[in-house]
């Protein structure tokens, strides 16, 4: 059943109908559409369009429909209705007859769909926040269990300075905390109701829109009807949040893919999140992580696509806006799935401490410590940097780590070097000296774990 047609003398071409209809994806807004309709029925009582008895009949029927939808949402797709609004109204009329035709009084699908989508986004943000915090907690637990796992830190994918696996985990906790903050900030701007703005100029009925917003769980009502029905900033913001969040998850995945490789061998992933090869029986592939990394692109694409859709639209509503739903549904579903999968990857991961330690002792990751040692002896840093570079070349020539060079060898480059240099070059000393806030010292890492646990409690 179309909600329009009196103006037309010909039926829509079936090809146009298939092109135009949105039920195949906006059926996901069924619950929100029903909840919004219940609130609207209450508002119509306040302006005398419905009696209290009529409103009760409508609300009872809508609540029955809500339970039917929750029990079997796929039933909606068996209909040839144009969109979810048409489907809900048609089902309501089936249940209460002509009374159902009064519900749309003073309401447009423009403010209706804007309201439905905001309600859906609010619920989805709450799910994302929960999944985000669960992943943060999993990272903190993994960090706590691996505070003593020393490994090389990298810049340019070359060994740079020693860190710990715990410190690595906590880096991603920081990223996820920013993702959490962005979602919470987006929720503030999302939490305003457009219902009652009509097609574009507002409703002709003196409805208390603030009261209506409260019934729907919004903190307030929007202030401009033109903007309200054409605003999709919340979609862009959520897609941006998702795009940034997926970049973080993609980097997390890439790190672990490398750590799990035969070349690094720092971790072993659980059999539960890996797969094999149809040809090579020895393979154990990090498919969960590769899919997280791969799915990042589709989320970036959804953001770019939505920006291009909106950039040239005049006020107010245009059918182009129907393109908002598939992208945001898919992007937020993808982000949510990847948050859950990342947490599952951490459940059962094994950190190979000895392999990590061996790698940290290679690659001259303690070279900066030698430079700092020279600075403490009064050598200007730029000169110390050059001296250590020459010492590294000598160590490479001899096939030794820096700490294995003899004192005589080291003193070829600077006579200020003495026996007290050797304790400075140990991995533990490298870690202990990074004791400023945010550093990799055991004390700082322990404090960071305690802080994160308290924040997430």
Swiss-Prot record:
Reaction(s) this enzyme catalyzes, per UniProt: 2-(N(omega)-L-arginino)succinate = fumarate + L-arginine
Enzyme Commission numbers on file: 4.3.2.1
Keywords from the UniProt entry: Amino-acid biosynthesis, Arginine biosynthesis, Cytoplasm, Lyase
Database matches in Pfam families: ASL_C2 (PF14698), Lyase_1 (PF00206)
Cellular localisation: Cytoplasm
Enzyme class: lyase
Organism domain of life: Bacteria
Cellular component terms per the entry's GO annotation: cytosol
Predominant location category: cytoplasm
A GO MF label: argininosuccinate lyase activity
Gene Ontology biological process terms in this record: arginine biosynthetic process via ornithine; L-arginine biosynthetic process
Family the entry assigns: Belongs to the lyase 1 family. Argininosuccinate lyase subfamily.
NCBIfam families recorded: argH, PRK12308.1
Protein name from the UniProt record: Argininosuccinate lyase
């Amino acid at each position: 059943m179309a909600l329009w047609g009196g103006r037309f003398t010909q039926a829509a071409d079936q090809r146009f109908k298939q092109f135009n209809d949105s039920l195949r994806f906006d059926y996901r807004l069924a619950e929100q559409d029903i909840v919004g309709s219940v609130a609207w029925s209450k508002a119509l009582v306040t302006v005398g369009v419905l009696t209290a008895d009529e409103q009760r009949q409508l609300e009872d029927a809508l609540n029955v429909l809500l339970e039917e939808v929750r029990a079997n949402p796929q039933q909606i797709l068996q209909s040839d209705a144009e969109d979810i609004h048409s489907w809900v109204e048609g089902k309501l009329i089936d249940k209460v007859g002509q009374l159902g035709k009064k519900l749309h009084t003073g309401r447009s699908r423009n403010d209706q769909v804007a309201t439905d989508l905001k309600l859906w986004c609010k619920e989805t943000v709450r799910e994302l926040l929960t999944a985000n915090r669960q992943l943060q907690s999993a990272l903190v637990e993994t960090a706590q269990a691996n505070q003593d796992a020393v490994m090389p830190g990298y810049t340019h994918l070359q060994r740079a300075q020693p860190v710990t696996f715990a410190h690595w985990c906590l880096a991603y906790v920081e990223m996820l905390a920013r993702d959490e903050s962005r979602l919470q900030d987006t929720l503030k701007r999302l939490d305003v109701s457009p219902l009652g703005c009509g097609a574009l100029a507002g409703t002709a009925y003196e409805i208390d829109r603030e009261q209506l917003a409260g019934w729907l769980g919004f903190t307030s009502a929007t202030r401009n009807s033109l903007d309200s029905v054409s605003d999709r900033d919340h979609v862009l913001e959520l897609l941006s949040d998702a795009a940034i969040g997926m970049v973080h998850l993609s980097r997390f995945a890439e790190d672990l893919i490398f750590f799990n490789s035969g070349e690094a061998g720092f971790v072993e992933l659980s059999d539960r999140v890996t797969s094999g090869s149809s040809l090579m029986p020895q393979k154990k592939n990090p498919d969960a992580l590769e899919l997280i990394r791969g799915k990042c692109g589709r989320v970036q694409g959804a953001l770019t696509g939505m920006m291009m859709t909106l950039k040239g639209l005049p006020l107010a509503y245009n059918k182009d806006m129907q393109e908002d739903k598939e992208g945001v549904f898919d992007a937020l579903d993808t982000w949510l799935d990847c948050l859950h999968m990342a947490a599952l990857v951490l459940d059962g991961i094994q950190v190979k401490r000895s392999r990590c330690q061996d790698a940290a002792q290679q690659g001259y990751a303690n070279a900066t410590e030698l430079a700092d040692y020279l600075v403490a002896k009064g050598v200007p840093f730029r000169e110390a940097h050059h001296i250590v570079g020459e010492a590294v070349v000598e160590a490479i020539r001899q096939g030794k780590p820096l700490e294995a060079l003899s004192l005589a060898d080291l003193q070829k480059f600077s006579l200020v070097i003495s026996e007290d240099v050797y304790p400075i070059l140990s991995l533990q000393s490298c870690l202990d000296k990074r004791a400023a806030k945010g550093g990799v010292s055991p004390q700082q890492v322990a404090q960071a774990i305690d802080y994160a646990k308290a924040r997430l409690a």
